[in-house]
């Protein structure tokens, strides 16, 4: 069975992927997070985003067609991927450990020494 189509990138992500190298060249000491921040600033300052929005819209249409085809062919019933959680939220969390409280005797000793 075919794999579920991946969601399309947003206009911003398409642009950032193409602009990332030039941002790195202009700012070689930037970390990944700083590159993303700079990219966000540049994106917000852009006047004409129509090229990237058109590319994103085309990718979204292709994704929607692929999803319809995927669902028509039975979807992903066997693996249950649609109900599966991803990332840290999917991991079972252990209950938090109780913090040890300071002995009340210590508190009383501090009060007496004042």
UniProtKB/Swiss-Prot annotation:
Q: Which SUPFAM superfamilies match?
A: HMG-box (SSF47095)
Q: What GO molecular function terms would the record report?
A: DNA binding
Write out the annotated subcellular location.
Answer: Nucleus; Chromosome
- Its primary localisation, in coarse terms, equals nucleus
What Pfam families is this protein classified in?
A: HMG_box
Similarity annotation: Belongs to the HMGB family.
Outline what the protein does.
Found in condensed chromomeres. Binds preferentially to AT-rich DNA.
- Full protein name: Mobility group protein 1A
- State the organism named in the record: Chironomus tentans
